[in-house]
């Protein structure tokens, strides 16, 4: 798995000193240069067993993304994910929002102020490598704050994770045409 805990929980730390992508830059594209600058923040965090949560480069007050993965949180049963021109539009995140519709889970794509983390019951990163990697807590050292989400994945994350895995592994019907069967490979 992408994170050592797999579909367990991983702690994260907010980094306000390094920007993953420049405003009006190429953050929305899969370009190596977008991630090279973030190594200065991710390597020391990973040595401490932490993932990194990056904020918007312009104001440093809105959640952007988790290292190389998208962020989402659950607030009162609503799946909330950042809307930003500086993050890669994740296929996994789009798939999870589609599954939210299937499962009648409301979802929003909008700017998320850091302070809103205190109102969320669940938080996770999502992307190709991790599918969903839930977040146990987010430490904000600059504000001397910690936001806790529990030591086990929450109910919405579990529901979405299992729905996605069931489609990927053929245990549930793929009504969206996401899977492609390759024969004679």
Predicted regions and their residues:
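Helix-start/capping segments and mature chain N-termini
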Residues: 1-185
